[in-house]
Amino acid sequence: METTEQIDKYSQSGAKVLPRSALILGALLFTAVVVRFYVAFRYEVNWDEFYYLSFVHQLINGEAINSFQTFHIHFFTWLQHVSSNEVDQIIAARLVMIVFQLGTGLCIYKLCRLQCSVSGALFAVLAYFAFSFNVRMGASFRTDPIATFLVMISLFYVFRDQLTWRASVVCGVLTAVALLITLKTSLYIPTFLMTVLVCFYWTQDRVGYAKQILIYGCSILVSFAILYSWHYFTISGLSSGADAGSMLSAADKTMNQREFFPRWFYFQHSLVTDFGYWIVLLLGIAFAVFSCFNQVQINRTASLKLLSLVLLLGTLLLYRNAFPYYYAFMLAPVCVLFAVAWDGAQHYLSDKACRFFSIIIPSLFAVSIVVNGFIFPTKSTLDYQRSFIEEIHKIFPQPVAYIDRCSMISSYSKQGFFMSTWGYEDYQARGTPVIQSAIENANPVFVVANTHYLDVLGVNALNVNQSKEDEHGGSESKDWLLEQDSEALKSNYIHHWQDLFVAGKVLHFTQEDELQVMQIHIEGEYTLEGEIDILLDGQIWKSDQVRYLSKGSYQVSSASAGEVVMRWGDHLYRSENVSQSKALFTGF
């Protein structure tokens, strides 16, 4: 245990470097925050962000929604008034996520200040804001930034020894909301449990502490039940049985992995791009372990609580969805160890080594901020995505059903499955031709070929294929879909513009041709394009004329040889102003 004299001596020695270091670290931290806004306005929108936005529009449109992990939708219905363009709506949502990230930074600072200096606390927050994946994706429109902020408030509460019943109730509510927003909040449970056990063992009032933790736990359970019930009955939800099944399936899918370290590729990448971060983290862990035994820098209780934060790193070994965006969620509490590393360097290292540490590491963080906050968003911008969606709304000014990867046109009704790795694995496991079913029953008018899963439409041949360096880390060209779904897409859609395919048919006639029979699954007006006229069920259909076709079989023939195109819509608009400069999605 530290004596008062030891603490005073350490504080006085730390005061010598406090003003300058705090100023420099604060300036870098301010730059990192400014960078967040640049990233929000410029960086390419990820497929997940469109997916989360689509839940908001499903609530607005009164569509059925799975109540599992969709609690966030109640707070973002105002996005519909920001713009008709989904990219602009996501930018507005990203700005809200920045606020939550700033709140998370404040929680990290407050946690650090329980044991460490001001400079150490600022250094820890800077480490969090400078981590490469966090710079680019920490404030993206996902549920993670909200849940991270809420659970960090609760973690700060648990770390403190002075507990009150009011704080226990409030933090229980916040934790319940975090769990409703995303199930991955449960990954914090080992850290919470170890912290509670350490506090319980060393507290002088075990009965009082146990009572407050019991209130906290009960508050979580009661709040979760009440808020989930309100959420379920507010939305047009699926059956409660389906929701429970989704929850159990998600838990099994994400944690019950046969593969050890399922996202090693991204961690390996981080070891290279953020090597300074991981070195300092190891140093912080080492100082915490050392202090646990000699109690020089911090006492044993604090050391054990700080080491409990490292347990979250273990989730990388098992958690299936440890993609780059996950690191901002996982590393928030872990970054508290950076304050230990900073103060430990002042305490244990020589003046020369300490000076080297305090210059080189912040410099590496500065490089990460510039590269990931300015260079990456400048190279991978959202401009083409915004222009593409703007043209889609011009082509289809009224909402229609469609098929794509991730609900990119979020305000319209997407059909089919969410084409992430998880969604694709479930699709293959079920073996149900859901796309064929959607085409036959939901009248999807167009397809946005924004994933390699839709290569069957001939995206590669048109040289507009999407980047395969996404969740897979690379993939070979092949027919990804079930045979029935592939045939349904090829026989019902034709290329229209860039990555857009619309309902239609291409008919070939020779002079020897007799009657052809075609099947229309997607009803609506069709324009006949070509140099020849045809007979449709015995009636002349001249080139450039528009005719409404209902679902069903039709007999077609032509007196002349040639090719005609039946394209959905009345002379459907085709943009000439927007050129494709890149794929719609280029990966993380």
Mark where each language-model region is.
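Extracytoplasmic catalytic/substrate-binding loops of multi-pass membrane glycan-assembly enzymes
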Residues: A40-F55, N66-V82, V87-I91, L238-S240, ...
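Transmembrane-helix signature of polytopic, membrane-embedded enzymes
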Residues: I108-A130, T148-F149, R166, S303
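Loop-to-helix entry region of an early transmembrane alpha helix in multi-pass inner-membrane enzymes
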Residues: H74, W78, E86-L106, M137, ...
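Hydrophobic/aromatic-rich transmembrane helices and adjacent perimembrane loops
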Residues: M137, D144-A147, L187-Y188, L313-S350
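Extracytoplasmic
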Residues: T185, F365-H508, G530-S553
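Hydrophobic, aromatic-rich transmembrane alpha-helices
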Residues: T104-I108, L197, D274-N299, K305-L313
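Membrane-lumen/periplasm interface segments of specific transmembrane helices
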Residues: V35, Q212-Q257, T273-V280, L318
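Membrane-interface transmembrane helices that cradle and orient dolichyl/undecaprenyl
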Residues: R113-V118, M152-V170, F200-Q204, A286-R300, ...
